[in-house]
Amino acid sequence: LFSVIMIDIDYFKRINDTYGHEVGDLVLKFIVDKIRSLIRSSDILVRYGGEEFIIYLPHTTLKDALKLAERIRKGIEDMIIDTEDGKKIRVTISLGVAERDLGETLEQVIKKADEALYRAKKHGRNRVSD
């Protein structure tokens, strides 16, 4: 039994284009630190491309993964990132959640989480979908 959460930073390109890549890197660091503060030591957080992340949640049901995803979404939404030049930046994330069905590979579960993430983005971003 395991679940996967796929995360994408909403409008990350706009952050890089507006504030520069140094601020974009700062945003990534803040998001990673926040996520790490909310997951268990047995959970695995990995970067999956530019502004996408995956969390592997061993021994976690879909219901519990959805609760965690919502806590992460809210935690990021409530965060204010202070840049070195005094700007305050807020970001949101979209999350797709999937649970492994019997016989599915990790790759198949990641694909389901990616499809759920697409639905979250399609329905307005800053939300969790399964």
State the predicted function of each range.
Residues I44-R47:
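A short pre-motif secondary-structure segment
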Residues S3, S94:
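Cell-envelope/extracellular polymer assembly enzymes that use nucleotide-activated donors
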Residues D17, L57-T60, E77, R100-D101:
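Residue-level recognition of strand-loop junctions within catalytic nucleotide-signaling folds
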Residues I76-I93, V109:
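Catalytic core regions of nucleotide second-messenger enzymes
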Residues I7-V23, I35, I39, E52, ...:
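Active-site loop/short helix in cyclic nucleotide turnover domains
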Residues V32-D33, D64-I81, D114:
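Alpha-helical scaffold within the catalytic cores of cyclic-nucleotide enzymes
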Residues L62-E70, E99-S129:
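Catalytic-core segments of nucleotide cyclases and related cyclic-nucleotide turnover enzymes
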